[in-house]
């Protein structure tokens, strides 16, 4: 499996690639949660545009922020990714319902979130190998 050294550990290049990918995901999601938690005009208007009332903007931002915090902490990163998958699935469903042409964007963010963990966490590679170790 690419990124695994001969002794079975994750290579330094794989770890750094995973950190960079995860870092980009975290930066985007922190920005998104901040505009919602602070109830900035862009966050409120965007939420109203997709059919949600203005009073749910801050709670949505807090939920997203909690998911991101769990994703950033190495011990809880997989739980954070699972919760982010649910959050991003809801965003995708909302965007599909509104016929938004960018409906795949949350899917891409979710894929990158999982790819970042997969590249840097040997536990996830063991749990979900991309290929069988049997010949």
Residue spans of the language-model regions?
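Short beta-strand/loop turn elements enriched in aromatics
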Residues: 32-36
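Hydrophobic alpha-helical transmembrane segments
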Residues: 1-9, 50-60
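Core segments of alpha-helical transmembrane spans in multipass integral membrane proteins
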Residues: 27, 31, 52-72
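Short juxtamembrane and helix-loop transition motifs at transmembrane-helix boundaries
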Residues: 37-49, 63-74
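Short, amphipathic, aromatic/basic-enriched membrane-interface segments that mark the entry/exit
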Residues: 48-56, 71-80, 98
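Extended, low-polarity transmembrane helix blocks
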Residues: 1-31, 75-135
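Charged, amphipathic alpha-helical interaction segments
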Residues: 38, 52, 91-94
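Short hydrophobic/aromatic-rich motifs at helix boundaries and adjacent loops
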Residues: 14-18, 38-41, 61-63, 84
